[in-house]
Structures are given as C-alpha cells and as structure tokens.
Amino acid sequence: MKLRILGYTNIYLLTFVFLFNINLNSQEEEQVFEEVIVTAEKRDESLQDVSQAVTAITENEIEAKNITSFVDLTAVVPGVTVAKNEGYKTVISIRGVGFETNQNAIAAPSVAYHMDGIFIASPFSLQTDFLDVERIEVLRGPQGTLFGQNSTGGAINVISKKPSTDSLSSKVQVTSGDYGLLKVSSSTNFPISDTLATRFSFSSVRRDGFSENIQLRQELDDANSISLRSDWIMELSDTSSLRFFAQYFDSDRNGAA
C-alpha cells in the first residue's frame, strides 16, 4: 500500500513540473498586434489613443465578415442599428438616436454619413454598396464639433482605397449563391507617372427574389444593382496632394413583400 502511494506522488510531481514549463514558455512568447490608424478626430492616430467611442472595421474584417452594405453593420458594431424603411430608405440609429422626424426625402438624419471625410446629405445615398473600401469608422455619441450638423447620435465615415503610384495592381472577386445570386467586383490601380495615379472600381449584384406576388407573378425582395467609381490623385509634394473621385450607383428592385 505504501509503495503505491509513493509511486502516485512521484507521477503527480512530474506532471506538475511539465505543465509549469509549458506555461512559462508560453508567457515568454511576444504577441504582436496590428496597429489600426483612424481619422476619427480629423487626424491620423492610433485607435488606442482616440478619446472617443470608435469602432474601426479594417479591410480584412470587411472581407472575412462579408460586410457589403450599411445594413451589415448592425451585426458587427455595438450600439448601431441599421434597417430598411419603406422598402427603399436606410435608417441608421446609434445608441437609440436616429431619425427624429417622419420619413421623407428631405428629413435630416441624426447620424452623419461621410465618404472619405465628405458629408453626404441625402439619406438615399445609404443605399449604395460598399465599393473598394479600406476602412469603416463608426463614432458613437455627439460629433458636432468635428463633423458638423446631423451628428447628434454619431457619425460613420467610409474610407475608400486611394490610388497609388507604386505599382500596377488588380483584384477580381466573383460570388455566387442561392436564389441565383451573382456578385462580381473588381478594382484596378493604374500608376500613370511618379506623381499621378488613378483607380477604377466596379461592382455588380444580381439576385432573384425571396418571395413572389402571386397575383402579378412578380418576384419581390430581389437585388439588381451596379456601382462604379473613378478615383484620381496627384502628388503635389511630400506633404500635399490633389484628389478627385466620382462614384455612380444604380439600383432597380421590385421592393419588399
């Protein structure tokens, strides 16, 4: 009986030492975190240094989580609710603050939408698909000091990829799925000279409807949209540049059931 107890004790001590060595080695390994640079306060700074409640969604997260429109932000950004209203308008609320008037074409929202730092006044612009996006910044809480009017609830800034004079590059993505879904997106960067470059992006989405109007024999909840973007940049000096971009979006849908 004593021999068995001693044998058990020895095994226990050896196991303890083995686990202790594993934990000690794992703590010695250095963990490297990617630094996220945001422009939430109108200047480039690390996300950890920002004194506001900010959620930054990087390009890798956008692709991994399949974030294609504003509606998808509801699932990934805390305190943000995005919904379709009246079948065609997109309504954004942050911490419960959103539209405070009846829905119409001239109603002023309480969450400001900015594209590359430029205020987009029309709420109908929220229908656009995300096209060639580098980062999405969501700022919660009043932002009137830096982002002006219509930002009582917060602000959303969508930052697109800038043209680069470094090298020629191109990217194409094709997605298919149920209900005849076919999505094609592409982006190409053209360096024209050492100081001038352009970037062209394209996206097309086609999908059959989820439901059908039996009387009219018409599919509802379908998707049929196209997005185009042309972006130009000229490097004037090491600290200044001139940028011009234009984006076109067209959507033709039968509406919801």
What do the predicted segments below correspond to?
Residues 33-35, 49-52, 57, 65-68, ...:
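Extracytoplasmic
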Residues 35-39, 53-58, 81-83, 91-95, ...:
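Soluble periplasmic/extracytoplasmic beta-strand elements of cell-envelope proteins
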Residues 71, 75-118:
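Extracytoplasmic beta-strand/coil segments of soluble accessory domains associated
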Residues 241-257:
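Flexible loop and strand-edge segments within Gram-negative outer membrane beta-barrel domains
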